[in-house]
Amino acid sequence: MSSNSAVQSKSPLLPKENPPVKAFPDNIQVSSSLLSFLIYILYTFSISGLSTFVITKYYIRPQWLYTLALRRALIKLYYNFMDGFNKRTDTLQHRVDDKKILKTIEKWSCIKEKLRRVANITEQEQQCIPAESSLDLSIQAMKGVVNAELYQFGSQISGSLEFDTPIGNLQKQIVSLKSKMINI
């Protein structure tokens, strides 16, 4: 019995061929685990890329993709066209403004010429009138000359000017001066 009890108290011996497996090895190689992780990531992305390709190829209708691309191309074409159109209208507007400025300069030179002529005529009138004549006569003569010149100038440019331009404002002043001189 004692030999029997001694046998029962002893645990059976494990075979030497199959030692117990450790869950985590003692020496882990970082490069191999990193390489396996990268391979796993690449595999996952390749599957998702293939699935995206399959979904867009067979499940999403290609007409939707084509219409979206066509819409984007048309919007881009429209914006390019409108941008070019705006640039062309801006250059044309500058040309029109330049022409208006040139016309204004020509009219100002015409006005200066008329004023020089009025000044020359008044000088001639002052020289012709004797020193004994009254101041009333010289004012009346100058008023007649200025009225004639202003009437001639106003009739030349009356139809071609707008009142919001500098020449138009000058024309308004001339008309008001004319009415004041007539009332004197």
Swiss-Prot record:
It comes from Schizosaccharomyces pombe (strain 972 / ATCC 24843). It is a single-pass membrane protein. This is Uncharacterized protein C23H4.13c. It comes from the Eukaryota. Signal peptide: none annotated. The chain crosses the membrane at residues 35-55. The keyword Transmembrane applies. Keywords: Membrane, Transmembrane, Transmembrane helix. Its main location: membrane. It is found in: Membrane. GO terms for cellular component: cytoplasm; endoplasmic reticulum; Golgi apparatus; membrane.
